[in-house]
Amino acid sequence: MDGSNDERLTQSVESFCLQNGDDGKLVLVDKMSQDILYSYDLKTRKKEVISCEGGSIDPQYVCFDGDWVFIADDCTISKTNYKTGECVYIWEVPEGKNVNITDVYIHGDKVYFGLYGTDSEAKDDTGLWCVNPDGTDSKKISSDEVNEVCFVGEEYFVR
């Protein structure tokens, strides 16, 4: 924490997040690597590949919930159990919709994500959305443009 022990974990980090709790795990998305998704143990300094086979194919956004890493690319959201390698699709952009996912965040019993409409027909879809972790009941929460989302208590903040 004093900056005296800097260490390069990877060449290129697209996204990262720290696991809640005492496990001290960091998840890294490394676009320059063949494996892309890693878990890094801050205590042992051990880096391990997390399998995301069968899930989002181009991870850009990640967040933790227990043993699950929630992963999003431009058009899909999936979750991977970093201990077992189990991977499950949660949600994907409906066919024919010109929108991109802009972030993903798990809070309580919902997965929150930003959508950005890339053409005039999809502009109404721009905003903060949520979905159940099993992929059901997706709904729009706000029309705010979302680059990042986080929660403090029960209040959300977007940038």
Give names to the regions the model predicted.
Residues M1-S4, D41-R45, N81-G85, N132-T136:
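Short loop/turn segments that connect beta-strands within beta-propeller blades
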Residues S4, E14, C52-G55, E95, ...:
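Disulfide-stabilized cysteine-rich extracellular repeat microdomains
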Residues N5-T10, K46-C52, E86-P94, D137-S142:
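A short beta-strand motif characteristic of beta-propeller blades
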Residues V13-D23, G55-G66, K97-H107, E145-E155:
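Repeated scaffold domains used in trafficking and secretory/extracellular systems
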Residues L26-D30, F70-I71, Y112-L115, F157-R159:
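Residue position within the beta-strands of beta-propeller blades
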Residues S33-S39, D74-K79, D119-W129:
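Structural motif
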Residues D35, L42, S51-Y82, C87-Y105, ...:
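Eukaryotic tandem repeat interaction scaffolds
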Residues T118-R159:
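Hydrophilic extracytoplasmic domains
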